[in-house]
Amino acid sequence: MTNKYESPLSARYASEYMLRLFSADMRIQTWRKLWVSLAKAEMELGLPISAAQVAELEAHIQDIDYACAAQREKEVRHDVMAHVYAYGKAAPCAAGIIHLGATSCYVTDNADIILYRDGLKYLRKELLKVVANLAEFADRHKSMPTLGYTHYQPAQLVTVGKRATLWMQDFLSDLEELDFVIGSMKFLGCRGTTGTEASFLELFGGDTQKIDRMNRMIAVDFAFTQCYPVCGQTYPRKLDSRILNVLSSIAQSCYRMANDIRLLQHDRQIEEPFEKNQIGSSAMAYKRNPMRCERICSLARYLMADALNAPMTASAQWLERTLDDSANRRITMPEGFLCADAILRLSQNVTNGLHVNEKIVEKTVREYLPFIATENLMLEGVKRGGNRQELHEIVRICSMNATAKMKNGEQWDLLADLSSHPEFGMTNAEMEAVLEPTAYIGRCPEQVDSFLARIRHQISDITKSDTEIDL
């Protein structure tokens, strides 16, 4: 324990990759790489910058003197200029050409775009691992009948695997949205204080082609093919809103799946992984709580709420820019990524070890199958000469009686009750023969096969993570 607050997202939940991605080292090193790229482009386009100066900048990307920068920031109250100063101390021969023609958002905004792009690509892989786990689970249980629920009340039969495809479909919708966001991300480039590139017109003597080439060169250095065609000082904050929206969408899908598993674990039909020495309760030693799924839901609520921040920030960007986005974005954006990372890692763990208690599932099906089969029994009775309306009334009365006995904890036998009515023209044994669960699952196995065939190419190159989350 320490005497300083530490975010649970970094202390307990997020991966090492995501923590490194949003670390101060990664952020400031990215700033320095952007300064190097700018200097290199300016040199190649004829500005008085030497190869030795560029080489010196490249040699000092990683040796960041945070104490020097912090002291300077206290004096000038400007974080970017504090790091320009610290970088200049590390590379004194190049100190005079660092940040030439640029404004703060050249490094802050472009670095954010780079980190967000890389973070989204990482989350894409994590999302696909969840889908791959569910695909395997769905295929394994595609023909296993289970009780379906509408309004959380017993309905018709589905299969365990078919239900998993509903979760998968949500995740694949998220994947489509995620791919769109990644594919549409653009670089800000180096555009000046209000996006007019006036400083570069001055530097390049009015040569607009050199300005365009400079921006293309810098964008390519960071694997971007496009810059925003127009901008103010910042990149459009609508991008932040898009990003957090898709992270929120992933959280919604994880929440829905985890909540379903929690409901099913209550009935002991399906259970999340439970370790041999895991303790469910400090007082109730027998407990097997769905703590992983509960944690998914808990973190998902936070992420869905976090996503509400970005639209307010995007809508409050005055004219060419205002700074009231800065402090907010420093918190909401990294924590959104860390939270999505944590949720997906938990979801991987759950889906990789999801356990079906087949005997419980079968018992639940047997308990409710007589009710489910009543329509088929009624149709068979009509085939044998019965009156459909009379049979319907008999089914209604017998079903209500059986339900009342269930609620009172009494023994009940719906089929025996129905077969005692000669209007059906069926014996109890003949009615029992109708109770084959697979006759009531419709096209579930076929639907699972068809669905998996359609998405197989999307998950074919995904390999399981070699480091599972330690819970």
Predicted regions and their residues:
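Glycine-rich cofactor-pocket loops
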Residues: 139-161, 271-287, 320-327, 352-372
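Long, amphipathic alpha-helical stalk/connector segments used for oligomerization, subunit docking
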Residues: 302-388, 394
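A short, charged helix-loop
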Residues: 213-233
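A helix-coil-helix interface module used to build multimeric assemblies
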Residues: 1-201, 206-217, 280-281, 291-295, ...
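Glycine-rich anion/phosphate-binding loop at the beta-strand->alpha-helix junction
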Residues: 174, 232-326, 330
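Alpha-helical transition-metal enzyme core signature, strongest for iron centers
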Residues: 77-80, 127, 131-134, 164-178, ...
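Short beta-alpha connecting loops at secondary-structure transitions
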Residues: 19-23, 68-70, 278-298, 320-335, ...
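C-terminal alpha-helical interaction appendages
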Residues: 353-421, 441, 446, 453, ...
